[in-house]
Amino acid sequence: MARQSLIQREKKRHKLEQKYHLIRRSSKKEINKAPSLSDKWKIHGKLQSSPRNSAPTRLHRRCFLTGRPRANYRDFGLSGHILREMVHACLLPGATRSSW
């Protein structure tokens, strides 16, 4: 189980990313449309002044049961070992174990 502080930090990043999403997207469009390099630098400075944690690359997918940041399956929102345990316990409908 991940520490609660890490999970809360990730939630805070997610809120910041949602808050600044439109601002960042519009700034990037302005950079692409700007005719001169000096205009691009001004817009880039505005983009850099937004909080670091508002960038979408700072987000991690976490297992919603354990909070584990690695080996997550997007379809289920679970980490690999929790997914395996739930499939073995028949708690996920439609998921089957492979055997060969």
UniProtKB/Swiss-Prot annotation:
Keywords: Chloroplast, Plastid, Ribonucleoprotein, Ribosomal protein, RNA-binding, rRNA-binding. One of its GO terms (cellular component) is ribosome. GO terms for molecular function: rRNA binding; structural constituent of ribosome. The keyword Repressor does not apply. It is found in: Plastid, Chloroplast. GO terms for biological process: translation. The keyword Ribonucleoprotein applies. InterPro entries: Ribosomal_uS14, Ribosomal_uS14_bac/plastid, Ribosomal_uS14_CS. Pfam families: Ribosomal_S14. Binds 16S rRNA, required for the assembly of 30S particles. HAMAP family: Ribosomal_uS14_1. Belongs to the universal ribosomal protein uS14 family. Part of the 30S ribosomal subunit. This is Small ribosomal subunit protein uS14c. The gene is rps14.
